[in-house]
């Protein structure tokens, strides 16, 4: 029987990605098999950087860590969790 991966999602606008975001994600890697940094698109919110630019910044920040991937999504976070089979949502303070 195949063991399920523990996948966690850390969702946010990351406009821009901060050292605090980076710290939360890297700490989460010790608890989960995979951490997905989910860059949300909110058209009603004015962004400093485009979604593509924010994704590229996050990909560059986490490029040396194989257990972290970066994606963008413009729907509900819970829909993304279902789509990727994630059971955990990481929250910062």
Give the residues covered by each predicted segment.
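Nucleotidyltransferase catalytic core that binds NTPs
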Residues: 1-93
């Amino acid at each position: 029987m195949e063991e399920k991966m523990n996948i966690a999602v850390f969702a946010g606008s990351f406009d821009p990605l901060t050292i605090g975001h980076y710290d939360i994600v890297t700490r989460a890697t010790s608890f989960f098999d995979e951490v997905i940094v989910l860059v949300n698109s909110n058209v009603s919110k004015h962004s400093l950087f485009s979604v593509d630019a924010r994704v590229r910044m996050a990909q560059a920040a986490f490029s040396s860590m194989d257990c972290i991937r970066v994606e963008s999504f413009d729907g509900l976070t819970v829909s993304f969790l279902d789509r990727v089979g994630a059971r955990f949502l990481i929250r910062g303070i």
